[in-house]
Amino acid sequence: MKALLDMGANVDERDERGSTALMTAAQWGHVDVCRLLLERGADVNKSDKQGDTALHEAARADEMDAVELLGEWEGVDVDAKNKHGCTALHVASHAGLGAMVKLLVRLGSCVHGQMKGGYTSLHVAAANGSNSSLSALLESGANIRHSASESKIHRSSSGTALELAEANEQEEAARMLRNASQREFERGGLFGDE
């Protein structure tokens, strides 16, 4: 890679999917290659035809070291959205990658960020029964009361993460959300008294 770059190769050259070398290196966890490309001027926020960035790809592949490097790189948009309005946090939440969710939140990803339809990462995790992600999001202060404006996730027409979990028969996720709601109620948080 270094030799190609030394000979003048375009650091942000795209393939037929619109992916760059940085996206591919991130997806496969080649952190040293990612660092080299970034040091040579690769655009950390460049997206492919689906709007995914290197951070999306690394998060989807559960490549923690690559996500850490990308997430700390100067100028990175940790909340960049793809064509579906999904951030890397939405992607990790859907996949049930609890440790990745925690890392992305630590790197500054907005736990309340919404994709199309008003869905947060909590909605995505609840609807899919991604309980590891759900737990990490709840620990990170995700808003359990937020109601999506429209819901095309599975069988529900709209609602809170709890309503989506119940509609999609995600019993453990629903139990976790009911318990979180009860704890918030006991603290007075459901009435805005926090």
What is each PLM-predicted segment?
Residues 2-9, 35-42, 68-76, 102-110, ...:
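Ankyrin repeat domain, specifically the short helix-to-loop turn at the C-terminus of the second helix
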Residues 15, 48, 82, 115, ...:
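Ankyrin repeat boundary/linker residues
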